[in-house]
Amino acid sequence: MAAPNLIGATAIIGKTSGTNLSSTNATTVLNNPAGSGKCLKINTLNVANTTNSVVNVTVGWYDAASVGGTQYKIVGSVPVPGNSTLNVIDKSSQYYLEENNSIGATASVADTVTVTCSYEDIS
């Protein structure tokens, strides 16, 4: 099924998700699998460093589900100071995830960063 026509959407549900970057590999933050029949509109995405030390963070849009395919960096290896938050996406720079797209994040040190994402599930 194709992603919905946004004008003809029958449901828009506000959601928030959280992800711990438990490794230094790319981790799926938000996923819209093929055949979902949905479009996900990302309103905000924040990265929080939960330690006292600087951690470098990369956040990217992927042209396949589950951080597959090619990554297109939204922010690349940005240093996040200890006990600080980086606002990566906000209402002035929203992203749409069509079917078979995802957002992923990577931290330079495992178990030091959490990512929260507020989005609209449109179908």
Predicted regions and their residues:
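C-terminal interaction-tip segments
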Residues: 2-38, 99-100, 106-123
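Short beta-strand elements of extracellular/lumenal beta-sandwich folds
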Residues: 37-48
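Short solvent-exposed strand-capping/beta-turn motif centered on an Asx-Ser/Thr pair
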Residues: 47-52, 108
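Beta-strand signatures of extracellular beta-sandwich domains
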Residues: 58-62, 116-118
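Intrinsically disordered, low-complexity Pro/Gly/Ser/Thr-rich segments with frequent PxxP/GP/PP motifs
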Residues: 65-100
